[in-house]
């Protein structure tokens, strides 16, 4: 039997998130800016989601985010919030 594929004009949100950024129904980047609260001093720092350098808190000099091959790894204890447009 053929597996039901779903509606091509109205794909589910989950299937759109799994697709490559250029093959989505509406093209959109995977990267974003985010506000990170430092767990030591509660200072808010704006960081790019795919940061390529180590991000350090400006007031207490602790490491907030470390680069990986894709998205930056946020240090445990730090809270983040995605910035809106």
From Swiss-Prot:
NCBIfam families: LSD1 (TIGR01053). Gene3D superfamilies: Zn-binding ribosomal proteins. The gene is rps27. This is Small ribosomal subunit protein eS27. It comes from the Eukaryota. InterPro entries: Ribosomal_eS27, Ribosomal_eS27_Zn-bd_dom_sf, Ribosomal_zn-bd. Keywords: Metal-binding, Ribonucleoprotein, Ribosomal protein, Zinc, Zinc-finger. Pfam families: Ribosomal_S27e. Binds 1 zinc ion per subunit. Belongs to the eukaryotic ribosomal protein eS27 family. GO terms for cellular component: cytosolic small ribosomal subunit.
């Amino acid at each position: 039997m053929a597996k039901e594929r779903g509606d091509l004009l109205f794909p589910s949100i989950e299937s759109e998130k799994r697709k490559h950024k250029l093959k989505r129904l509406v093209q959109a980047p995977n990267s974003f800016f985010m506000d990170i609260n430092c767990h030591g001093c509660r200072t808010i720092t704006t960081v790019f989601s795919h940061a390529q350098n180590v991000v350090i808190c400006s007031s207490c000099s602790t490491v907030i985010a470390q680069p990986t091959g894709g998205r930056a790894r946020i240090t445990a204890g730090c809270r983040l919030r995605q910035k809106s447009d």
